[in-house]
C-alpha cells in the first residue's frame, strides 16, 4: 500500500484468444435489456413484484384484453426473509422471444410468475443467479398475526424445494419436482453471533393435539381467549401467563417474540429435561503409532489442543477432559488437581478385549481445576512417544475405553489418527482397489462398511449421548468409508487430510486451524430435532448426520453448528387450504447449563397450478436434495446408476415442462425451455456428475468416500461452491477489488464461469471450491505480472503445489491478491480452511522434462477438473449436455 503505481499488464500483445469479459459482463447485453427503474429501489421485494402485477393488470384493462383483474394494495403483502425481488431473466444476445410471465396462474392471491427462458440462449449460464435468494414466499398480511419481515423464516435457516406446494400428490408427481426442505438450525459456530430472540419466562404455548408451537400464523379466537393452530386447526386455550411477563406484569401479547418472529428460542423449563444439563465433556483419542509420529500428526494435534484450551466451551467452568494415547496398547493418563501437585501417571492396558479403567476419577478431569497439569501433559505427549516404531492402532478398543470414561455424562470422543485400525475389535484390512475401481463393484466393495462394529457401536453411543468426530491425516489408506460411520450416526463429522506431513507448514496450518475451530465451537448436548407439517404433509425421509430414533425424531448426542439436513416431504392427502406450514424444533442442552428450544416456522402458499409450482421452485435446494438421493443410489446400486439418476431427473423435468407448460402456452421454437428460476439447475445437476463423489474414473477410495461424506452434510452455500467452484479473474479485476470498502470489508471481484474458454494464457485466476483453492498462473504471463505477484520474473522459479503467496512490501497488486484469498477464507459458520495450490499453466516455451513436470501435470489435471462447464475426462461439456437433453426430450 505504498505509493506503488498501478501497473497495466500488456496482455493484448498475446493473440491466443479473445479477452474474457469483465466479471460484471458475464455475457453480452441483448437489445431487450433495459436499465432498472430507480424508483424500485425504495420498494420491498413483495411490493416490487406486486407493482409489476398491478402494471400488467392496468395495462391489460386499458387495452380491454383482460377483465376482472383485482386491484391489489401491494402494502398488504409481506415477503419475509428475502433480500431481493424475483428477478426476471436478463435478455441476452440472440434472444428472440418476449419474456413475459405465462401459464395458468392463480387469481386472487399473490404467486410467483413464470418467466420462460431458452437454456441455449442462456449460454454462458448467468452464474450470478447462484447468489440470488429463492423465489419469494408471498404471504398476505391477513395471514400473519403481526405482519413483519421476520414473520416467515429466512432461507438461511430453512429452504423448501417448492415455494408453492401442490395441493395434491398427483400434481406433485406430475411435476417431477421434489418436495423437501434443507434445514440449518444454527448459522454460526458460536451461539453468541446474531442469536434469535430468547424467551426466558418459561411460557411455552403448544397445540395440545399436534404439539406444534405457537407462531406468527395462528389465529386468536373468542376475544383472544383461545388460539387456532395453523397446523391441525384445533382451537386451544391461551394460558394466562401468555399475557404477563416474568414478574406477572401484564404485557401486550402482540409484542411477544413467538408472535412476531418465525425463528425464536425458549429457555426450557425442567419438564423438558430428564436430568440437569450436563457439562461439556471431551475425550481425545490420539494415535501414537509409528505413522502418527512419523508424519508429525501427534505433535501437531497436541500443540493445537494445548493452544486451544482457553477457547474450549467452558462458560460454567464445568468442562471436563480426558486424553488417551493409543497404539497396540491403550495409554491412560492420571491427571491430579493442580493444587495436589504435578505428578502425572501413565497407565497402560494391554488387554484389548476387555480394557478396564484404572483410577477413572483421575482420568476424566476438570479443565478448570487441572488446567496446569493438562498443559504439562499435552506438552509431554509428543516426547513420550517420539521413539515409537509400533505400526499398530487399536481404534475399536480405544473407542470403547473412551466411551466407558464419559458414558455417565455424555459428550464428544474426538479421534486424531494417521493409521488404519489394524488390531482389536473393529480391525480393518486394506481393500483391493485396483481390481474394482471404476467398475460396477466399486461402491459395494470399496465404500461399504468393512466391519459392523463401526455401525453397531453408534447405537451404544446414542444411548449414552456420545458423539464421535474423526480427524484422519495420512498418506496411506485409512478406510474412510468404514470409520466415517462413527460420526454419521452420532451427529459427528469425519475430516480428511490426505498426504499430511508436519514438514509442510501449509498442512500444519490447515489442520491446526480446522481442529481448533472444531473443538472450540459451541457444544450442545442431548439434542433432538423434529419437523412438523400442517395437515396433508408428512416427513418421509431424513438425510444428514444423526440417529433416526423414530419416524420423525432425529437424535444428536451433541448438536453440530456446521452441518445441514434434508427432510423429504410427502403429500398424504389433498390440501384444501391456501397455505401450509412447516416447523422445525430443536431441543438441546447448551454448555451454559441451560436447556433450550429453537423453533423455526415457515408459511408456504399452495396451488393447483403446475405453472405456479414451477415458478416457485428453488434450484439450489433441489440440487441438495438430488445429491442425497444420488448418494443413496451409489450405496445401493453403484455410481453408474447414481449418474443416470441425476441425468434422468433433469430430463424428466425438461420433458414435463415442455409437455405440460411450454407447449400449451407458447408458439414456436425455443429449443430447450425452462423457467428463469430454474435456469441454473441443469448446470448444477450436471456439475454433480463431475464431482469426485460421482464421476467415473479411478479415484482413491478414501478420497471418494470423503467427497460423499462432505456432500451429505455441507451447509447449502458451501455445497453449491463445492460442486460449482467460484472462479475469479485476478489480472484484470476492478480497481476496488482486493481493497477494503468504506466498511472495512475486502471487495471481491465478480466470479466468472467455470470454463477454460474464459482463461487467457497470460492471465491469473483463482478457483475456490470451499475445500481447496487453485491460483492458476497462465504459462505465458508477462514478467511484470509474475514479479508483482510472486516477486520473481522467472515463471519457472515459482514453487508449484501447496503454498502461500509471498508478502511483497512494494507491490499493491500482491497485497490485493492476498486480500482476496484471506477474504474467501473468512468464515464464522464452518471450520474449513481451504488450502491454496499454486498452478502454472502450460506454455510452448516450457522445458519438456523439467524437474517438477509430473507434479505440474497432476496439478493442472486436478485444477481443470474444477472447471465443470468443460469436459471432465469423458463427460460432456455443459453445452453438449444440454444438446443431449434436447435430443432425449424430443423423442
Swiss-Prot record:
The record's InterPro entries line, in alphabetical order, gives: ADF-H/Gelsolin-like_dom_sf, Gelsolin-like_dom, Gelsolin-like_dom_sf, Sec23/24_helical_dom, Sec23/24_helical_dom_sf, Sec23/24_trunk_dom, Sec23_24_beta_S, SEC23_SEC24_subfamily
Q: Which GO terms describe its molecular function?
A: signal sequence binding; SNARE binding; zinc ion binding
> What is a single cellular component term in the Gene Ontology annotation?
COPII vesicle coat
Q: How does it sit in the membrane?
A: Peripheral membrane protein
Keyword entries, A-Z: Cytoplasm, Cytoplasmic vesicle, Endoplasmic reticulum, ER-Golgi transport, Golgi apparatus, Membrane, Metal-binding, Protein transport, Transport, Zinc
Enumerate the residue ranges of region (Zinc finger-like).
207-232
Task: Please report a single Pfam family linked to this protein.
Answer: Gelsolin
Provide the GO biological process annotations: COPII-coated vesicle cargo loading; intracellular protein transport; macroautophagy; positive regulation of ER to Golgi vesicle-mediated transport; positive regulation of protein exit from endoplasmic reticulum
Intracellular or extracellular location(s): Cytoplasm; Cytoplasmic vesicle, COPII-coated vesicle membrane; Endoplasmic reticulum membrane; Golgi apparatus membrane
List ligand-binding residues for Zn(2+).
207, 210, 229, 232
- Role noted for this protein: Component of the coat protein complex II (COPII) which promotes the formation of transport vesicles from the endoplasmic reticulum (ER). The coat has two main functions, the physical deformation of the endoplasmic reticulum membrane into vesicles and the selection of cargo molecules.
Q: How does it assemble?
A: The COPII coat is composed of at least 5 proteins: the SEC23/24 complex, the SEC13/31 complex, and the protein SAR1. Golgi apparatus membrane; Peripheral membrane protein; Cytoplasmic side.
- Report the sequence similarity comment from the record: Belongs to the SEC23/SEC24 family. SEC24 subfamily.
Q: Which PANTHER family match?
A: SEC24-RELATED PROTEIN (PTHR13803), SECRETORY 24AB, ISOFORM A (PTHR13803:SF39)
Name of this chain's protein: Protein transport protein SEC24
Give the species this sequence originates from: Eremothecium gossypii (strain ATCC 10895 / CBS 109.51 / FGSC 9923 / NRRL Y-1056)
Gene transcribed to yield this protein: SEC24
